[in-house]
Amino acid sequence: EGTAFVGTSTVALKLYELSAKYGKRFLGGGSASNYAIVMSDANLEKTIMSLRDAKYGNTGQRCLAIQNIVTVGSDEFHEKFKNAFINAARGIKVGYGLDESVDMGPMASLRYKENVLKWIEVGLEEGAKIALDGRNLKVEDYPYGFYLGPTVMVDVTPDMKIAKEEIFGPVANLLKAESLDQAIEWINGNKYHHSAAIFTSSGRWAREFKTRVKVGNVGINIGIAAPMGWFPFGGRSLSGLGDFHPQIDTWQFFTDKKITIVRWW
């Protein structure tokens, strides 16, 4: 009666088209290029650890992963955050994924690894720089593993392809915005509206952010706005396609409705 799908927006659009052609319902999750905004009043230590996990957890291979990290504030604050984040990323232990002492495992396949390497090259061609390079990482005892180390790109701007498209790997882009307004404009201007997060101690900034960003999942001092249990989950625009969307629509997708009109004599 219907199709549910999670993957790239290109495939989701094709499946949506086919579902409509044959009169089937469709629920689709597409690509993402998620942003996290770090305000100058954020708890830096906790923010760094949250964003480290939000970026490099699952080796960055999840639609909820944070890809673009934007600091809002002075140049001094941006440099302080950048240095702290790079140090945290550098401390990640990469290795065999079932080893409990390991923080980050390999890419899922050679094709995925090569795709991430291509995106890094695209970023360099666009004018970004590498502040932490994980391309040549070697893991002892696993010479043929599809490993990449944590990578941090700096001098990134929102018009670059590496900021607009989904990298799907352990690459973090660091950007600097002049204001929260500008940061929100960058998020809403992206073609993918899956998830976004803000780190701040200000309730006013948090409320403004969650109200104005056009994404399906919002985190406030949470890097991964991941649904737990029966929480809804969704995206907007090219990140969330189909007839059904989060909350009540989720169970309606799996339910057939019937209207019965009765008269007793």
Where would I find each of the regions flagged by the language model?
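Proteins with a high burden of low-complexity, intrinsically disordered sequence enriched in S/T/G/P/A and R
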Residues: 1-3, 72, 189, 202
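ALDH superfamily catalytic-core signature
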Residues: 2, 8-157, 180, 220
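Short catalytic-loop micro-motif centered on adjacent basic/acidic residues
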Residues: 2-5, 195-197
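Conserved C-terminal structural/oligomerization subdomain of aldehyde/semialdehyde dehydrogenase
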Residues: 37, 87-93, 120, 140-265
